[in-house]
């Protein structure tokens, strides 16, 4: 029963716990009906009645269907969030740079003021370490913290890092994760926020510009609904969005910026190579492999990436080559093998464009003119290089047939 506190769940999600719900359980209709629309009370989406009508004279929400169907003739169930015992949990004893410390202090001020704040920092600035003091301050006062990110791989990476740097068990939630358990610190994909209501004193959205969170009204609704009425919201990004920039200009959102990496070295500038010659690409890969540094290669689509990886295996039989995409069942294992040096070359779609760190890596982008490689995406991809103080430089090659 403890795993229900702070949650917003359907009857199906409750399972056997439904028979033992306490008296203080709060219920909501799954949808609110108007003359023309059905409004989902889990994700806030409004749909025209005629487009979402079921044969049983009820309505459903298509927007959050992947989390289980919400219907107008069924209820949503909520138990108010529990209070946790105050505890000191921060194990990290590293030192922030003066610029990082300034951002960290701004986050503490935002917590004191129960306000919203945007942290706009370059890739490799050390955003994760900058939130530690804020997270620790909430947990040490008995509060709850949620850290959400649009991408599953980023959520896994954050969970690994914070599990190392905090002494409490951390619940990790995504489509393939273990079930939720009660804890003051939750790391999840942004879709999982739809299953929380008034749960977090502090909510942090990392990589706020990434798909599927960016410009997704349902996920912004989830971010608002998942945190307590009086709480703090922190947005983290290296590439802000028009929506957030407008809020900053209107004075509705505070913004702090950090334009340098934690090790003080400048960002690595990509080199654009206007050529589609496979011979040139293979030549530069061969030259890069002579350095011994790991090579991360981005492909625009899954089919091309898979074929390209097979071609590289035939051309470079002495290299250990992997391929990952959103459909890869062994994705987490392959990423870890690359991080540990068991793979020397990793080909990936844009799933690894952000939120992951591979020390001393070089990056090649094939068909960088492809429409899926947006400005934001290419900035994030280039930011994978030079993140390690042991090697703050590196290669970033954009192979392109022209500017898009």
For the regions a protein language model found, what residue spans apply to each?
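Hydrophobic positions on the alpha1 helix immediately C-terminal to the Walker A/P-loop
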Residues: 130-134
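Conserved RecA-like helicase motor core of SF1/SF2 enzymes
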Residues: 207-210, 335, 339-392, 400-403
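Conserved strand-helix element at the start of the C-terminal RecA-like helicase core
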Residues: 119-128, 138, 143-158, 285-313
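Post-DEXD/H (motif II) to motif III coupling segment of the RecA-like Helicase ATP-binding lobe
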Residues: 198-272
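Interdomain "pre-motor" coupling segment immediately N-terminal to P-loop NTPase/helicase cores
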Residues: 33-83
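N-terminal pre-P-loop "Q-motif" helix
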Residues: 92-115
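Conserved segment of the helicase C-terminal RecA-like domain
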Residues: 228-243, 382-404
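Conserved helicase motor
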Residues: 149-157, 161, 170-181, 188-195, ...
């Amino acid at each position: 029963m403890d795993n229900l506190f702070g949650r917003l769940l359907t009857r199906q999600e409750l399972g056997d716990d439904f028979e033992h719900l306490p008296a203080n359980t709060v219920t909501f209709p799954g949808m609110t009906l108007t003359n023309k629309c059905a409004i989902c009370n889990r994700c806030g989406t409004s749909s025209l009645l005629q487009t979402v009508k079921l044969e049983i004279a009820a309505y459903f929400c298509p927007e959050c269907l992947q989390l289980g169907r919400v219907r107008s003739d069924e209820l949503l169930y909520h138990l108010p969030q529990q209070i946790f015992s105050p505890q000191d949990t921060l194990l990290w004893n590293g030192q922030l740079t003066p610029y990082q410390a300034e951002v960290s202090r701004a986050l503490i001020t935002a917590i004191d003021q129960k306000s919203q704040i945007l942290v706009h920092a370059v890739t490799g600035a050390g955003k994760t370490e900058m939130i530690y003091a804020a997270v620790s301050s909430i947990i040490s006062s008995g509060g709850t913290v949620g850290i959400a990110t649009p991408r599953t791989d980023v959520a896994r990476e954050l969970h690994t890092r914070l599990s190392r740097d905090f002494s409490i068990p951390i619940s990790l939630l995504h489509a393939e994760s273990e079930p939720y358990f009660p804890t003051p610190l939750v790391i999840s994909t942004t879709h999982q926020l739809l299953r929380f209501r008034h749960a977090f004193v502090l909510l942090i959205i990392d990589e706020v510009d990434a798909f599927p969170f960016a410009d997704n009204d349902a996920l912004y609704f989830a971010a608002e609904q998942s945190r307590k009425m009086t709480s703090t919201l922190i947005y983290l990004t290296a590439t802000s969005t028009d929506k957030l920039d407008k809020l900053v200009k209107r004075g509705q959102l505070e913004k702090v910026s950090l334009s340098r990496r934690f090790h003080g070295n400048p960002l690595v500038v990509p080199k654009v190579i206007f050529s589609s010659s496979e011979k040139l690409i293979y030549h530069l890969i061969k030259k890069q492999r002579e350095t011994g540094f790991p090579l991360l290669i981005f492909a625009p689509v899954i089919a091309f990436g898979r074929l390209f990886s097979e071609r590289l295996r035939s051309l470079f039989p002495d290299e250990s080559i992997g391929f990952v995409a959103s459909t890869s069942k062994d994705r987490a294992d392959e990423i870890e093998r690359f991080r540990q040096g068991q793979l020397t070359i990793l080909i990936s779609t844009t799933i690894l464009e952000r939120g992951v760190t591979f020390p001393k890596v070089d990056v090649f982008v094939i068909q960088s003119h492809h429409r899926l490689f947006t400005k934001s995406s290419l900035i994030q991809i280039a930011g994978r290089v030079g993140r390690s103080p042991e090697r703050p430089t590196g290669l970033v090659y954009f192979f392109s047939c022209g500017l898009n």
